Amino acid sequence: DETPNMWTFIMLDSYTGKNWQVQFSTKGTDYMFAVPINYLCKAYPSSSDRWEGRFKMFATQNMWTFIMLDSFTGRLWQVQYDTRSLDNLLCVSINEEVLETGDRSIFSIQPMTSMYQYYLINNESGAMWQFQWTTQGPDYRWIKRIN
């Protein structure tokens, strides 16, 4: 996914949920790299699974932060990249609970007025949750059902 920095991108494996920060440069290969943001798969497909596009990334108004959605289950993660320090790369759970099980994309997200809050929507049932990401720590990261 594209970031506001023309030399830095987030590469997403939409099949497993793994993602990397990719850096390009005109200064040569010493300044180019790809580093994992999260090392572990968020889903483990079998060879017969057809999960194309299962995971989706959404840019937030914060240039360093994306929301990753498992559109099959409703699970959410806050993904953060950094151009100054690789120690600041982050992929943390907003919602570990599997809200639905299935083999197709049924969830989407929509921003609210606050840059930190979104709606998670089950496009089949109409069920909705409100969730929040944060830079302040896990106590400020939450999700709640609203209907």
Segments from the language model and where they lie:
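Beta-propeller blade-edge signature
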Residues: 1-3, 46-60, 99-113
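Short, exposed beta-strand-loop hairpins at the edges of beta-sheets
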Residues: 125-135
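Ordered, small/hydrophobic-rich secondary-structure cores
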Residues: 1-5, 11, 26-29
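Tandem-repeat architecture and repeat-register "anchor" residues
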Residues: 22-23, 79-80, 131-132
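Trp- and S/T/G-rich repeat-edge/linker motifs of beta-rich repeat architectures
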Residues: 26-51, 82-103, 134-147
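Primarily extracytoplasmic ectodomains and periplasmic/lumenal surface modules that are beta-strand-rich
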Residues: 15-19, 26-28, 73-76, 127
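A general "mature secreted/periplasmic domain" signal
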Residues: 20, 42, 57-60, 65
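Short beta-strand motif characteristic of blades in beta-propeller domains
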Residues: 7-14, 64-72, 117-123
